[in-house]
């Protein structure tokens, strides 16, 4: 195991390894996962983050007691460099364990194993071909690869396996690309390239999107797929291994595998949906309204979308027990005050909701909050009311905390349900169930982070 040492002096050329292990992750309250935007790992569907890797990581981070930050890597050639630089803590991207990768990274126990298969497309006029012609076209053995061109991602485990075949004397033409595996599979389906290689689970899933594809021979069998991390994170590795050992034997793990790798027709509809970050470019049917109204308050429209996802799950007809209605869950009195005649009308509801947000933001102008803190204080105020958040701020200041930093104020919001604190002389509005507003802010910020990652 490599050790973590002090940074190099300017005279030293070698870069010391980045160090961030389990204790650092728990102290920061966040695990940063490097992943790819793919149908197997991670994507957004109808405003919700989903994917096999995401589902596992979400449960693992819950076990650790930390939040999850998904970092989507556009070019997987750089994923190991990003890990090495400390831009993430773990690689979770349907990542094969190979001898070359093991020399640089630590891997967990295998999550599952998969063959690597050749992906090819059925040619137009297949039904008119004779049996002999079909047999000549189909790749049924390694020898059928002689003289064929196979395109794979540069630096991938597929490239390593093809090189092994080439070193065995099989004259394969290998074309390297910086495209993702799923992009290359699509290119095979579209006739842009002849062949590619994919993990069998990924190939079979993509075959539901492109019916003209088949997975032919395996060029490598039962290759393990796992999470990868820096050698300088032994405690994280041990924790992940212990968790995987237990979780892989549960019904929950079997259900996740079924959802993403076996119930392919259902998964296909999600991936190809216009409300998928893979198949389309929409978060919800109301994106145009979000884009228009968010400009009034200087917000990223995806932040407004994240807020509506939390408020109503994009359901314009929903009504709470307290009588709050529509996309932004406004009380009729609030809606009327901000000009909404019908809260079931999405345009009116969003317009009134944004006007309400603007009024809340004005209440915080005198505090000179930075942009991110203004967003968080505004979200909390929208949920719990400005008065209770002002109480939490005053309480934080009374105990020596920074009243303009949400991370320092939020613990005192949680204390407003305790008599010792809500009876404090600086607290004007008494009891508040602060956990609701605290979780509200975290959830909206979490959705916003996913939307910014998944949609470019």
Task: Kindly give the residue locations of the regions a language model identified.
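Extracytoplasmic small-molecule ligand-binding "clamshell" domains
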Residues: 4-103, 173-178, 183-186, 240
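Bilobed "Venus flytrap"/periplasmic-binding protein-like clamshell domains
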Residues: 32-41, 46-62, 113, 117-179, ...
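Catalytic and substrate-binding regions of cell-wall glycan-acting enzymes that process beta-1,4-linked
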Residues: 378-451
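Extended ligand-binding regions for polar small-molecule ligands
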Residues: 8-16, 22-23, 54-63, 120-157, ...
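Periplasmic-binding protein-like
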Residues: 37, 110-127, 200, 204-242, ...
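Export/targeting segments at the very N-terminus of extracytoplasmic proteins
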Residues: 264-313, 347, 364-368, 456
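A ligand-binding cleft/hinge motif common to bilobed small-molecule-binding domains
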Residues: 77, 81, 93-104, 163-165, ...
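Substrate-binding/active-site groove segments that recognize
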Residues: 317-341, 348-359, 444
């Amino acid at each position: 195991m490599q050790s973590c040492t002090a940074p190099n002096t300017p005279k030293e050329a070698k870069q010391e390894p980045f160090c961030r292990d389990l204790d650092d992750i728990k102290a920061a309250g966040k695990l940063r996962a490097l992943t790819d935007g793919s149908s197997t790992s991670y994507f957004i569907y109808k405003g919700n983050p989903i994917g096999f890797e995401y589902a596992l990581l979400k449960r693992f981070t819950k076990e650790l007691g930390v939040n999850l930050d998904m970092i989507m890597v556009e070019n997987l050639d750089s994923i190991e460099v990003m890990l090495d630089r400390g831009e993430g803590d773990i690689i979770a991207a349907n990542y094969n364990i190979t001898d070359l990768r093991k020399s640089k990274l630590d891997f967990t126990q295998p999550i599952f194993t998969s063959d690597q298969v050749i992906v090819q497309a059925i040619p137009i006029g297949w039904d008119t071909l004779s049996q002999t012609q079909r047999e000549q076209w189909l790749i049924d053995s390694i020898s059928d690869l002689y003289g064929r061109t196979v395109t794979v991602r540069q630096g991938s485990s597929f490239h390593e396996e093809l090189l092994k075949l080439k070193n065995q004397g099989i004259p394969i033409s290998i074309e390297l690309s910086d495209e993702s595996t799923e992009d290359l599979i699509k290119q095979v389906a579209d006739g842009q390239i002849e062949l590619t290689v994919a993990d069998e689970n990924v190939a079979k899933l993509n075959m539901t999107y492109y019916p003209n594809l088949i997975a032919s021979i395996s060029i490598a069998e039962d290759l393990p797929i796992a999470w990868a991390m820096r050698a300088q994170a032994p405690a994280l590795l041990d924790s992940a291994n212990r968790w995987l050992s237990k979780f892989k034997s549960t019904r929950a793990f079997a259900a996740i595998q079924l959802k993403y790798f076996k119930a392919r027709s259902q998964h296909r509809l999600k991936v190809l949906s216009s409300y998928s970050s893979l198949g389309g470019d929409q978060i919800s049917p109301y994106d145009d309204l979000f884009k228009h109204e968010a400009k009034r308050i200087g917000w990223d429209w995806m932040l407004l979308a994240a807020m509506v996802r939390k408020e109503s799950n994009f359901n314009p007809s929903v009504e709470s027990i307290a009588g709050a209605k529509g996309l932004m869950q406004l009380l009729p009195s609030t809606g009327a005050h901000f000009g909404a005649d019908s809260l079931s009308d999405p345009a009116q509801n969003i317009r009134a909701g944004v006007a309400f947000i603007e009024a809340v933001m004005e209440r915080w102008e005198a505090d000179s909050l930075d942009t991110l803190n203004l967003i968080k204080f505004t979200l909390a105020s929208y949920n719990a009311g400005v008065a209770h958040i002002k109480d939490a701020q005053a309480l934080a200041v009374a105990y020596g905390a920074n009243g303009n930093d949400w991370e320092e104020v939020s613990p005192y919001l949680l204390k407003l349900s305790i008599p010792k604190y809500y009876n404090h002389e600086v607290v004007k509005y008494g009891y508040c169930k602060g956990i609701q507003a605290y979780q509200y802010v975290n959830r909206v910020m979490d959705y916003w982070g996913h939307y910014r990652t998944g949609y470019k």
